[in-house]
Amino acid sequence: MILKSQANKLKFTKQAKVFHYGSISLITEPCRSAHMKATEEAKEAGALLSYDPNLREPLWPSPEEARTQIMSIWDKADIIKVSDVELEFLTRNKTIDDETAMSLWHPNLKLLLVTLGEKGCRYYTKDFHGSVETFHVDAVDTTGAGDSFVGALLNQIVDDQSVLEEEERLRKVLRIANACGAITTTKKGAIPALPTDCEALSFLKRQVEQ
C-alpha cells in the first residue's frame, strides 16, 4: 500500500499515544510527504514520537541522500534508537563512544539509544547516561531484534513516561528490552520470533536462576 498525504486524515495519528516511525518512507514521494504530515499530526496530538532510522542503504539513491533525509526529521523525535552501524554512518565516525553518540543529541530529545548487538545498549538522557549488558544466546537470525527491542521499550513506557527521568527504572526497562531482542534472535523470521510478555519474563527468570 502506498501511503499518501490524504490518507493521514485517518484518526490513528491523532489518537496514538506513541507514533513510531523509520526512514524508508522518506525515500520517495508520495510517501515522504505523507510521513511528514503524519508525524506533525501525531506530535500536535501529544503522542510520544519514537524514531528508528532502520537504515537500508541500498534502497537510497546515494549515501548522502540517505543522511540528508534521515536527519531532516531528527529533531522531531522524543526517542531515537540507532544501531552502532547507523551511528557510524550518520556521524562518519568509526569511533563508537559517548562523544560520537551525543553529537546526535538535539534539545527536545528525551532518550537516545545506541544498540550494540551482543554488547547490549547505551542510553543517554539530558541528566544521565550509561550502558546495559545484553544476554548471551545461540542466535540463528538477527532479523527483527532491533524492532523487538524498541517495541519492548515503548510497551513499558507508553503509560508512564516518568521512567525516562529515573535511571534505575529506565535500566530495568532496557534490561527487558535487551531480553526481548535476544530472544528474537533465537528463532527464524521477524514477526514470528517476537516474544510475548510471558516469554520475556520467563527468560529473565531463568537468567537469574543460572
From Swiss-Prot:
Pfam families according to UniProt: PfkB
Reaction catalysis annotation: D-fructose + ATP = D-fructose 6-phosphate + ADP + H(+)
Source domain of life: Eukaryota
Gene3D superfamilies: 3.40.1190.20
First-level EC class: transferase
SUPFAM superfamilies linked: Ribokinase-like
Functional summary from the UniProt entry: May play an important role in maintaining the flux of carbon towards starch formation.
Protein name, per record: Putative fructokinase-8
